[in-house]
Curated annotation (Swiss-Prot):
One of its GO terms (molecular function) is RNA binding. The keyword rRNA processing applies. Belongs to the class I-like SAM-binding methyltransferase superfamily. rRNA adenine N(6)-methyltransferase family. RsmA subfamily. It is found in: Cytoplasm. GO terms for cellular component: cytosol. It comes from the Bacteria. InterPro entries: KsgA/Erm, rRNA_Ade_diMease-like_C, rRNA_Ade_Mease_Trfase_CS, rRNA_Ade_methylase_Trfase_N, rRNA_adenine_dimethylase, SAM-dependent_MTases_sf. It catalyses: adenosine(1518)/adenosine(1519) in 16S rRNA + 4 S-adenosyl-L-methionine = N(6)-dimethyladenosine(1518)/N(6)-dimethyladenosine(1519) in 16S rRNA + 4 S-adenosyl-L-homocysteine + 4 H(+). Its EC number is 2.1.1.182. SMART domains: rADc. This is Ribosomal RNA small subunit methyltransferase A.
Length: 293
């Protein structure tokens, strides 16, 4: 059995050997506790039938744990300085393919079709860079990829937002999007002390299992997400003010918006953060004739 990468000593030795310096702009924080990585792989239920998709492999600490259990691992790394390190640390494994690419610009459907066509199970497993967590999550959710779901480590405050309940400070448009596409569960908190370099905040591992069907019936998804985003645009404002000020054409349709809210039994003075996903669905369906294409 090969020695784990995710120990303080081995990580330091690898970084010193290659003269690697962390780039703050890329949100590079490498995990140095292999037990946490094994737990992540367990939670993701990685098996010999799984094709794992990783984002930001760093020096390969999570990648090697995935490679030991999965049929194949496909990883996206934006920092070219890490490619020779990954070629070295992952040399014992012949089931890993590294793409030197920004995952936000990648055609994931094409990569999956080319690299993971022969696996029956696909899962995203990643320690996401803090600076692009939300765009990556939104891309993975909205592109309707042929995956079972994702297990990701991210900033604890973002994890709290993903799994928040209505009426709480963490509840927002990201929560609704996650709820619409997946079932979310925060698995564990990961202290900042198990990273190199140590970040200023704690992390959390969250599991998102893709839903076969959304939990609500939505007539026009474009309008649904438009209404959700508008409702949270200015958290201190009322739902009515947010909709009229932030929906395109909202001011011109002010009276109709108020009529719709009253007809649905939604007090126009409520704030967006108090509505649950079912209320947002009803509201967007009623507004779709006004704001749909």
């Amino acid at each position: 059995m090969y020695k784990d990468i995710a120990t303080p000593g081995r990580t330091k030795e690898i970084l010193e050997r290659y003269g690697f310096s962390f780039k703050k702009s890329l949100g590079q924080n490498f995990l140095i506790d292999a037990n946490i990585l094994r737990k992540i792989v367990d939670v993701a239920d990685i098996s010999p039938d799984t094709g794992a998709i990783e984002i930001g492999p760093g020096i390969g600490a999570l990648t090697e744990q995935l490679a030991r259990r999965a049929k194949k691992v496909v990883a996206f790394e934006i920092d070219g300085r890490l490619l020779p390190i990954l070629a070295d640390t992952l040399s014992p494994y012949d089931n890993v393919r590294i793409f030197h690419q920004d995952v936000l610009k990648a055609d994931l459907h094409a990569v999956i079709a080319e690299e993971l066509a022969d696996v029956s199970d696909r899962m995203v497993v990643a320690n996401l860079p803090y600076y692009v967590t939300t765009p990556i999550i939104m891309k993975l959710l909205t592109e309707r990829l042929p995956i079972r779901g994702m297990v990701v480590m991210l900033q604890k405050e973002v994890a709290d937002r993903l799994a928040a309940k209505p009426g709480t400070k963490d509840y927002g448009s990201l929560t609704i999007a996650v709820q619409y596409y997946t079932e979310a569960e925060v698995i564990m908190t990961v202290p900042r002390t198990v990273f190199m370099p140590q970040p200023n905040v704690d992390s959390a591992v969250i599991r998102l299992v893709k839903r076969q069907h959304p939990p609500v019936v939505v007539d026009d998804e474009g309008v649904f997400f438009q209404v959700v985003r508008a409702s949270f645009a200015q958290r201190r404002k009322t739902l009515f003010n947010n909709l009229t000020n932030n929906l395109p054409g909202g001011k011109e349709n002010k009276e109709q918006i108020e009529r719709v809210l009253v007809a649905l039994g939604i007090d126009p003075r409520r704030r967006g953060e108090t509505l649950d996903i079912a209320e947002f669905a009803s509201l967007s369906n009623a507004l779709a004739p006004l704001f749909g294409k």
